[in-house]
Amino acid sequence: MAEVRGVQRVLFGDWLLGEVSSGQYEGLQWLNEARTVFRVPWKHFGRRDLDEEDAQIFKAWAVARGRWPPSGVNLPPPEAEAAERRERRGWKTNFRCALHSTGRFILRQDNSGDPVDPHKVYELSRELGSTVGPATENREEVSLSNALPTQGVSPGSFLARENAGLQTPSPLLSSDAGDLLLQVLQYSHILESESGADPVPPQAPGQEQDRVYEEPYAAWQVEAVPSPRPQQPALTERSLGFLDVTIMYKGRTVLQAVVGHPRCVFLYSPMAPAVRTSEPQPVIFPSPAELPDQKQLHYTETLLQHVSPGLQLELRGPSLWALRMGKCKVYWEVGSPMGTTGPSTPPQLLERNRHTPIFDFSTFFRELEEFRARRRQGSPHYTIYLGFGQDLSAGRPKEKTLILVKLEPWVCKAYLEGVQREGVSSLDSSSLGLCLSSTNSLYEDIEHFLMDLGQWP
C-alpha cells in the first residue's frame, strides 16, 4: 500500500527525526549535540490538565499519514473539537506502535509518570544509526496487509512453541487456533496502517512448531536492566510490546517496563545489573532498600529472597502460561485495569514447577465481540495480577499487597480502547465517519476465525 487517501506513504522514522529537529513542538527536542538522544512529551491522557499541546506530536503523525482530518466529514468547530478530543487516545496508540515497530529507537528513560514534566527519552539504535539505507526503507514501507495467512505466515514471536512437550489446556491450541491472534493483529487498522512494520517471513515446511523468532531485545529494555547489544537484531520482526508490566510494593510503583519477548522471567538479585541474558527476557524486582517502613522493608526483602530461580511467563498459542520455580508462593487473578470490580477469575495459587495457563487471548476476543455487539454487559477483563507471598483472595485492597505485579497485554488494551471509541462515536450520527475505518471488517474477520475454530456460540 503505497498511498493512503491520496497521501504519499510517510516513513515514520525519517518523519520523527525531522519533527524533532524542527523545534515546532514543546518538549520534543534533542538532548545531545550528536543528535542521537531525544525526548518526547508523554503526558497521561487521563490527567485533568491535559490540553491540545500535549497531543500535538501524536496528531501530527495522524495528519502526516492522512488519518486526520477524516475525509468527507465537515463538522462545525464545536463538534470538530469534541471529535478531536475523542481521537487523541487513538493517535497516541498509533504513534506508540509506530515508534516501537521501526526498530530504530531504544527507550532509555520512561519519565511519563513525572507529575511536572512527563516525557520519555529515546536513543537512536547503534545498529541502524541515524541514516536510512534502502533495506531499512523497504522494511518501513511494507504493510502488514501484505503478510496475510495466505502467504504461509507462521505464528512468529507472538505464538512461539519452543517447548513442544508442554501440555496444553484444550485442543484449541492447534495450528489454526495458534494463528488466531496473529491474524487478528494483521487485520487491525492500527497495526496495518500505522506501524510501518514488517511481515513475518514465511517458513519452510516442518519449521512451524520449532521456530522462535528473536526480537531486538535491546529496543525493549528498561533502566532497571542494562541493555545488552543483540548479536543479530531481527529488525524484520514486528516489535509490538507484548506486556506492560508494573511492579508495586504495597501500592507504591517501583518499576514500569515493557516486555517484547514471548518469554520473560521475573527475578530478584541485588546484583541485577549483572544480568545479561535475553532469552527469556529478565524483569528484575527492584531492591526495597528505599522503603521508609522498616517492617515492610524486612518482609518484602524476605519474600524477594525466595523468588529465585524466578517466575517465568510464556506466550504459547493463544494463551499466556506461568511457571513458578521459587519457594515464594504466587497467587494470580484476572480483573479490571484498576482492580475496582470483582475479578473475572477467582484468585488461584500457582503450583510450583507446574505450567499454568493464566490468560486466553481467544476468549478475550470472543468476549470483546460480544461486548461490541451488546450481548455482554461489561467489557472483558485483561489485567493480570500476581501477588507474591500473599493470597489475593484474602479481602485486602490490592494496594496493601507487599509485592504486586500487574500485567496488561498491550494488544487487548488497544482493541478495547478502539471498541470504546467506536461506541462513543456511534452515539452521534453526525460523527459516524470518525470511527476506525476498518473496525467492521476487522470484527467480521474475528467472527469468521472464531466460527472456524468452533468457539462461536
Curated annotation (Swiss-Prot):
> Where in the chain is the Glycyl lysine isopeptide (Lys-Gly) (interchain with G-Cter in SUMO) cross-link?
398, 400
Quote the record's activity regulation: In the absence of viral infection, maintained as a monomer in an autoinhibited state and phosphorylation disrupts this autoinhibition leading to the liberation of the DNA-binding and dimerization activities and its nuclear localization where it can activate type I IFN and ISG genes.
| Stretches for region Necessary for the interaction with NMI | 238-410
In its UniProt record, which GO terms are filed under biological process?
A: cytoplasmic pattern recognition receptor signaling pathway; defense response to virus; immunoglobulin mediated immune response; positive regulation of DNA-templated transcription; positive regulation of interferon-alpha production; positive regulation of interferon-beta production; positive regulation of transcription by RNA polymerase II; positive regulation of type I interferon production
Gene induction: Induced by lipopolysaccharide (LPS). Induced by type I interferon (IFN) and viruses (HIV-1 and SeV viruses).
Where's DNA bound on this chain?
9-126
Q: Is Transcription regulation among this UniProt entry's keywords?
A: yes
Q: What is the effect of changing residue 427 to A?
A: Strongly decreased transcriptional activation in response to viral infection
One Gene Ontology CC term in the entry: nucleoplasm
Phosphoserine modifications at: 425-426, 429, 431, 437-438, 441
Disulfide bond annotation, renumbered to this chain: none
User: Which residues are reported to carry the modification N6-acetyllysine?
Assistant: 92
Its annotated compartments are: Nucleus; Cytoplasm
Stated consequence of mutating residue 425 to A: Strongly decreased transcriptional activation in response to viral infection
* Annotated GO MF terms: cis-regulatory region sequence-specific DNA binding; DNA binding; DNA-binding transcription factor activity, RNA polymerase II-specific; RNA polymerase II cis-regulatory region sequence-specific DNA binding
| Cross-link Glycyl lysine isopeptide (Lys-Gly) (interchain with G-Cter in ubiquitin): where in chain | 329
Keywords from the UniProt entry: Acetylation, Activator, Cytoplasm, DNA-binding, Immunity, Innate immunity, Isopeptide bond, Nucleus, Phosphoprotein, Transcription, Transcription regulation, Ubl conjugation
Entry coiled-coil feature ranges: none
Modifications after synthesis and translation: Acetylation inhibits its DNA-binding ability and activity.
Describe the function of this protein: Key transcriptional regulator of type I interferon (IFN)-dependent immune responses and plays a critical role in the innate immune response against DNA and RNA viruses. Regulates the transcription of type I IFN genes (IFN-alpha and IFN-beta) and IFN-stimulated genes (ISG) by binding to an interferon-stimulated response element (ISRE) in their promoters. Can efficiently activate both the IFN-beta (IFNB) and the IFN-alpha (IFNA) genes and mediate their induction via both the virus-activated, MyD88-independent pathway and the TLR-activated, MyD88-dependent pathway.
Q: Which family does it belong to?
A: Belongs to the IRF family.
Q: How does it assemble?
A: Monomer. Homodimer; phosphorylation-induced. Heterodimer with IRF3. Interacts with TICAM1 and TICAM2. Interacts with MYD88 and TRAF6. Interacts with NMI; the interaction is direct and leads to the inhibition of IRF7-mediated type I IFN production. Interacts with GBP4; preventing interaction between TRAF6 and IRF7, resulting in impaired TRAF6-mediated IRF7 ubiquitination. Interacts with TARBP2; this interaction prevents IRF7 phosphorylation and activation.
Q: Know the name of this protein?
A: Interferon regulatory factor 7
